[in-house]
């Protein structure tokens, strides 16, 4: 029998790990940026729990970024209990949520979320995901991003990458634009214990996903920060950031859950870019690098084999 199955896991162990993950990621981003310092705001949720919101603004590479930790508990609203199809109404949720918006249109936007959820009726599960939103798709970097994720997934289960990559393609999709938010990544939810996989093993997977964020993103920051760009690239960045806003306000489950459970609005909306633009009926010039990027924003791209 696998000894990992025998290990006990409770909400305090999970919460503690998430707190340290927030610390480590903030340190890595600050070190690579070279100028920015995260400002911390501690907050309490009236219904129970609270969190640590950490924001970096007007730094060297990062224009606006957030690394949020939260641990909330209380009574689950009826509407959400029905959506989650759970019987219990007392819930506990903890996790880390990250979004980085760089100044340069050549440094990609990145998002990661790792979370744990339990309900008084006994259900327990992990969820999360990591996805990359380049303003201009660099196939080699998209390939590297997916290779790192696939390697991490394969350490745990050879079906994870393909399953969770498809889930990300479907989830990070802006239906009214018929385009993906970026080059995707992985997305997963309701990862609980099964006959073959313990909750502890699920946690080990989530930890490994959390741990790849800093090495991957600091690499992209370093590689792309000094590439020159002009007004045209900044205009396209503002349009692509607008798409990011559309996804977050219309489709993002975390945004909906946070607002529906009286979460902290400023923390929930920290994923918003500092500036965005909605140029009416924007169409890129045929053959332009903007057109090339838009051609990549579709589901089922084999990013491992793309470059």
Placement of each model-derived feature along the sequence:
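Short, Lys/Arg-enriched N-terminal segments with co-localized hydrophobic residues
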Residues: 1-5
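Gly/Pro-rich turn-and-neighbor structural signature
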Residues: 7-85, 194-230, 234-244
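Internal mixed beta-strand/loop scaffold within catalytic domains of large alpha/beta enzymes
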Residues: 53-127
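Glycine-rich, often proline-containing surface loops adjacent to acidic residues and nearby aromatics
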Residues: 66, 92-95, 124-133, 179-200, ...
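Compact, glycine/acidic-enriched structural inserts
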Residues: 120-165
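Long, charged, mostly alpha-helical binding arms that flank functional sites
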Residues: 152-205, 220-222
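An amphipathic alpha-helical core segment
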Residues: 165, 169-187, 222-267
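TerminUS-proximal long segments
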Residues: 265-307
């Amino acid at each position: 029998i696998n000894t990992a199955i025998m290990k006990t896991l409770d909400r305090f162990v999970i919460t503690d790990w998430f707190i340290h993950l927030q610390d480590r990621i903030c340190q890595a981003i600050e070190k690579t940026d070279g100028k920015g310092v995260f400002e911390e705001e501690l907050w309490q949720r009236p219904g129970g729990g609270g969190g640590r919101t950490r924001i970096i603004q007007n730094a060297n590479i990062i224009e606006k970024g957030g690394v949020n930790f939260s641990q909330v508990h209380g009574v689950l609203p009826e509407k959400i209990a029905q959506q989650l199809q759970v019987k219990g109404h007392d819930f506990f949720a903890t996790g880390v949520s990250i979004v980085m918006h760089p100044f340069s249109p050549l440094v990609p936007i990145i998002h990661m979320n790792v979370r744990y959820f339990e309900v008084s009726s006994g259900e327990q599960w992990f969820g999360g995901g990591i996805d990359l939103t380049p303003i201009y798709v660099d196939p080699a970097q998209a390939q590297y991003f997916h290779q790192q994720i696939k390697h991490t997934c394969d350490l745990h289960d050879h079906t994870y990458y393909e399953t969770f990559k498809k889930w990300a393609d479907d989830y990070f999709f802006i239906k009214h634009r018929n385009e993906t938010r970026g080059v995707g990544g992985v997305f997963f939810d309701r990862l609980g214990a099964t006959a073959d996989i313990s909750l502890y093993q699920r946690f080990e997977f989530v930890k490994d996903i959390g741990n790849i964020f800093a090495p991957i993103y600091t690499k992209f920051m370093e590689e792309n920060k000094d590439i020159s760009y002009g007004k045209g690239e900044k205009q396209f960045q503002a349009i692509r950031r607008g798409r990011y806003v559309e996804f977050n306000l219309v489709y993002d489950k975390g945004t909906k859950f946070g607002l529906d459970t009286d979460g902290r609005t400023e923390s929930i909306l920290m994923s918003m870019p500092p500036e965005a633009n909605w140029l009416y009926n924007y169409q890129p010039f045929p053959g332009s690098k903007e057109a090339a990027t838009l051609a990549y924003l579709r589901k089922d791209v084999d990013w491992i084999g793309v470059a």
